[in-house]
Curated annotation (Swiss-Prot):
This is Peptidase T. It is found in: Cytoplasm. Optimum temperature is 55 degrees Celsius. Its cofactor is Zn(2+). It comes from Lactococcus lactis subsp. cremoris (Streptococcus cremoris).
């Protein structure tokens, strides 16, 4: 194996349950995330990172790989998140499959679940590689503990394995709660103190992403008028029926299951209530600012029209922006995309530059003034029992980080 400790690190990290909690009001959202951040801080110190500190204000643990050159090199930041998605993460039992043939069905532990190339054709890309997958009872946690392990392996390489590799100052940060959308809300750009950064939080080999959705959340409240159904004619206003009518007024094909690429959507997450009152929760997504604003306006227009027809304000939308397409920031200076693209090409990795149908911590951090695109970390089928990662892709992620650092140093004066 090219990086001897990469896989052991990854296996160690995924066995720690760091599932974030969207119902929590604390930062980080769980005590397990606090404890894991402190553990990572100790590991960072053991590798030789300097100025390692935990920020109580935002749950990030930060450390520095000091420069070993006198050149005026731009400072690079590398970020990954410690939490995992909303799927069982207790008792993660990673399985290792060496020299996968690209065709066989992979049994997930003792469960009835399998990774079948017929269902997951991406498996065919991994012939001859070593795969780490689940036992079918949990997620794997490659999102984003692959990124964490890769960054730690990079730090080990620069500080201990090849300390003569010339580089400028590199800052490392591991944070909480990316999966519940609040991880970067309190990120401290001034404390991180770099010129540009990358999140190592992407998927398959070659992903290089600087365009995300713009995102908003909407809660629609419906006020009904409940009376006995036996005498309800011309009197009852059923809040649940209002919710159904509202949803049906949205564009039929603008839903996640019917969209792809650059197409945006409305996504109904939750609907509950009674004839007296009901509540619908949506997310709104689009890549283009104009269309994003049109979607939010449409949700208000539907409510206004229904209220006018009802003669009362029974439909109340509450819409709140969540994050914005970071391309608006990154495109002002594409040099950090160019250097990452060049690094991959130098390593015979074909860059995959496509819009993310989602967001990253970098979306928010970029709008705080620190451009932060996203690099591949290797995971596939993330957020569930079918998740897997290739060890060889993880190694190439470390290679890519090293090449970015080398190229960044090369252009310095």
């Amino acid at each position: 194996m090219k990086y001897e400790k990469l896989l052991p690190r990854f296996l160690e990290y995924v066995k720690v349950n760091t599932r974030s909690d969207e119902n929590s009001t604390t930062t980080p959202s769980t005590q397990a995330l606090v404890e894991f951040a402190h553990k990572m801080g100790e590991d960072m110190k053991a590798l030789g990172l300097k100025d390692v500190h935990y920020l109580e204000s935002n749950g990030y643990v930060i450390g520095t790989i000091p420069a070993n050159t006198d050149k005026k090199v731009r400072k690079i930041g590398l970020l990954a998140h410690l939490d995992t998605a909303d799927f069982n993460a207790e008792g993660v039992n990673p399985q290792i499959l060496e020299n996968y043939d690209g065709e066989s069905v992979i049994q997930l532990g003792d469960t009835e679940f399998t990774l079948d190339p017929k269902d997951f054709p991406n498996l065919k890309n991994y012939k001859g590689q070593t795969l780490v997958h689940t036992d079918g009872t949990t997620l794997l946690g490659s999102d984003d503990k692959s990124g964490v392990a890769e960054i730690m392996t990079l730090a080990d390489y620069l500080l201990n394995i090849n300390p003569d590799f010339e580089h400028g100052e590199i800052r490392v940060g591991f944070g909480p709660d990316e999966e519940i959308g609040v991880g970067a809300d309190k990120f401290d750009v001034a404390d991180f103190d770099v010129d540009f950064a990358y999140t190592v939080d992407g998927g398959p080999l070659g992903e290089l992403q600087y365009e995300t959705f713009s995102a908003a959340g909407a809660v629609i409240e419906f006020q009904g008028k409940n009376v006995h159904p036996g005498t309800a004619k011309n009197m009852m206003v059923n809040a649940l029926q209002l919710a159904i009518d509202y949803h049906n007024a949205l564009p039929e094909f603008d839903r996640p299951e019917k969209t792809e690429g650059r197409e945006g959507f409305f996504h109904l997450l939750k609907l509950d209530g009674t004839p007296e009152e009901a509540r619908a929760q949506y997310i709104i997504r689009d890549h283009e600012e104009g269309k994003f604003n049109e979607r939010k306006a449409l949700m208000q227009e539907i409510a206004d029209k229904m209220n006018a027809e009802l003669g009362q304000n029974r439909v109340k939308p509450l819409i709140k922006d969540q994050y914005y397409n970071m391309a608006q920031i990154i495109e002002k200076d594409m040099s950090i995309i160019d250097i990452a693209k060049k690094a991959m090409e130098n390593l015979d990795i074909a860059p995959i530059i496509e819009p993310i149908r989602g967001g990253t911590d970098g979306s928010k951090i970029s709008f705080m003034g620190l451009p932060t695109p996203n690099l591949f970390a290797g995971g596939e089928n993330m957020h569930g029992r079918f998740e897997f990662v290739s060890v060889q892709t993880m190694e190439k992620a470390v290679d890519t980080l090293l090449e970015i650092i080398r190229l960044n140093n090369e252009v310095a004066k």
